[in-house]
Amino acid sequence: MEQSNGYETLAGKRLLVLGGTHASLDTVKTAISMGIHVTVTDDAPVSKRVAKQIAHSVAEVSTNDIDGLVDLIKKEKIDGVFCGPSEFNIQNTIRVCKAAGLPCYTTEEIWNRCADKTSLKQYCRKHGVSTSEEYPVSVFLTEGADEDVKYPVAIKPADGCSSKGITVCYDRASVLSAVEKAEKVSASGRVFIERYVDNGGRIFNIRYLINDGEICPYLAIDTFISDPINKERLISAFSRYPSDLYGQYMATADADVRKMLRDMGMKNGTVFIQTLPLDGKFYCMDMGYRLSGGLFYKLTEPLMGINDMKMMIRYALGGVMCTPDEIERIGRAKDLYFAQLTTPIEAGEIAEIRGITALKQDPTVIDVLQYYREGDCVSQSVIGTLGQHFSRVSIISEDKDELYRSVRRAIDTISVIDTEGNEMYLQRFDLGRIGV
């Protein structure tokens, strides 16, 4: 007999969600579906915030006004605080939970260890986790001092996210201008430079659930970036499950990664590790001690009955991270195939959107998350970041061939037209990259 997951005890609980943008929309939808009363707050009006438009109640307290949030928690008799994958609001969640005495899956100290790319490199080296060479900015300040640098190199904000401020450079001159760009994006003004692992644009993503210190790998997905040739748009274009690299990763890298996560102090929550597979090694590129923007629980729920979004909400409201039954389900995954298509569009004002209604009628399409609407403007400043994505289409099937037929239909069907009549969805994923 299947054990209770504890979700039924959450009905009527009151959850405060920080941030009303698309980043928290799925959090609000999920919490409402669990019977939870949801209040959404930030400093913008309801008309400007999609998540506020579906919440039970709203407030206009800024998400970094900790004192104001504590007062709101007392006034509304809030039982827990959470947010979506926004790293800015996760930090605010950590602080307000501490101030209000509410549960939080991590502390500010542990969060900072995980979010800082320089810190991550140090932990990788300490535990034998493969990682590419790192170079100090000083190496590029003097002509000739970079003779030992293995180009291309990637310049990143040390504390960045969402692919913002990242540039791939092939010479010293371009590095210097890229450093300025990354410094502007970094909250701390710090920049991180490493050898770019050029493997054709494939990322191996491994996800772990952490329950009272027990670290359990539960999902491995391949992601392919949008622009592997020019390397100007290092954002996701396509993801698939299962990954044919899972067995190799488990045999060669998993044990060291688990030791690293344990040493970082993680006790509960969900974490994803992004690696670049090349020549039998998995080079750790980034990690997130949080839910991901990919919303992969839309796969894991039908696959194995696990939903890390619901788990994190349950924990925020005083419940357990994982039940024993949920841990056991990891080994009972069904034979399913999954794909997620992300659709980067060009800058401009959207006049017309085509194909989304037809796409939603496809029985293999389990979710279409649309970030822009007709009349919205896509700024040039978001090109090359996750803000360039128009939509995220999740597809699932028991048949691999059927899955890829549906993916191809989605690629061919979606159309976004600007006010001058031009197609904005130009960089469509080439399934030939994965042999389909």
Model-found features: residue ranges?
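A conserved helix-loop-beta module that forms one wall/lid of the active-site cleft
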Residues: H56, K98-G165
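ATP-dependent carboxylate/phosphate-activation module, predominantly the ATP-grasp catalytic core
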Residues: D198-I203, R207-M266, T270, P277, ...
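Conserved ATP-binding module of the ATP-grasp superfamily
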Residues: S130-S132, P152-A154, T167-G200, N230-R240, ...
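A short glycine-rich, hydrophobically flanked beta-strand micro-motif that places a catalytic Asp/Glu
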Residues: E194, N205, K267-D279, P324, ...
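Conserved hydrophobic helix-helix packing surfaces used for dimerization/oligomerization
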Residues: R14-L16, V153, I215
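A structural supersecondary motif
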Residues: V271, L359-V378
